[in-house]
């Protein structure tokens, strides 16, 4: 597990609301550093499918689809293109938590950390595009623990 979650970035680096350009640059550098550590242990180049699980990823899917309310059926299994996501993440990084909280698909507890999540997603997209020629992401309502349990159960 890499230490680069949206809460960590928001609390430690992206403290302004919205984050300053300098804070975003620092957050980008931090995420790149963490992803470099991941690359040392994970064969990124052999990745064929990127699955974004829960949290920031499901929120991005709801926003990208223009949903008026959070709809887990529309979100789970949705496929998002990196080019469209980059436009969306840039918008999320620019807006204040007050602006973001107006959107009904952004959970109230996520409005103040979603910009940090957007920085993480940008870093992941850059890495996968460059090293594995992956340009889409499939969204899952499930999280990593569901996957671990399924694997242990032999599913």
Describe each PLM feature range.
Residues 1-155:
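Helical "lid/coupling" subdomains associated with nucleotide-phosphate turnover
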């Amino acid at each position: 597990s890499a230490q680069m979650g949206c809460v960590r970035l928001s609390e430690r680096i992206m403290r302004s609301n919205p984050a300053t350009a300098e804070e975003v640059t620092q957050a980008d550098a931090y995420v790149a550093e963490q992803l470099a550590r991941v690359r040392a242990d994970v064969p990124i180049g052999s990745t064929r499918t990127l699955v974004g699980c829960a949290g920031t990823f499901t929120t991005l899917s709801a926003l990208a689809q223009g949903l008026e309310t959070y709809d887990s059926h529309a979100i789970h299994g949705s496929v998002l293109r990196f080019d469209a996501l980059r436009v969306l993440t840039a918008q999320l990084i620019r807006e204040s938590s007050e602006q973001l909280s107006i959107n009904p698909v952004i959970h109230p507890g996520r409005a103040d950390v979603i910009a940090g999540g957007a920085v993480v997603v940008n870093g992941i997209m850059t890495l996968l595009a460059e090293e594995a020629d992956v340009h889409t992401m499939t969204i899952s309502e499930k999280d990593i623990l569901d996957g671990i349990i399924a694997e242990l159960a032999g599913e």
